[in-house]
Amino acid sequence: DIAGSRGQPIFATANGRVVYAGNALGGYGNLIIIKHNDDYLSAYVHNDTMLVREQEEVKAGQKIATMGSTGTSSVRLHFEIRYKGKSVNPLRYLPQR
């Protein structure tokens, strides 16, 4: 999880298509899932506002949501990368600090 402030922007990590944008999955709150290719998905969880819709094409660095606490008790971004359906360490895909 990545801590932050409510309303802080969340950006797409890579180009892709939004395959899910909603809040029907228990415990995830407002969730966005982007399919980048046949192997990779990224998930952005607990968003305050979602700025994209399902089937929308997004570009790397595009603002897709704002940070929030939907489905949890504190403001945070739960960020996942999945490779062939399996969760992998997302730090490999984030910019160096």
Curated annotation (Swiss-Prot):
| Record key words, sorted | Cell inner membrane, Cell membrane, Lipoprotein, Membrane
TM segment ranges: none
Q: Which GO terms describe its molecular function?
A: metalloendopeptidase activity
Q: Report the coiled-coil segments.
A: none
Main localization is membrane
Cellular component GO terms held in the UniProt record: cell division site; cell outer membrane; plasma membrane
Q: How does it sit in the membrane?
A: Lipid-anchor
Localization: Cell inner membrane
The similarity annotation says: Belongs to the E.coli NlpD/Haemophilus LppB family.
Q: How is this protein named in the record?
A: Lipoprotein NlpD
Q: Which organism is it from?
A: Yersinia enterocolitica
Q: What is the lineage of its organism?
A: Bacteria, Pseudomonadati, Pseudomonadota, Gammaproteobacteria, Enterobacterales
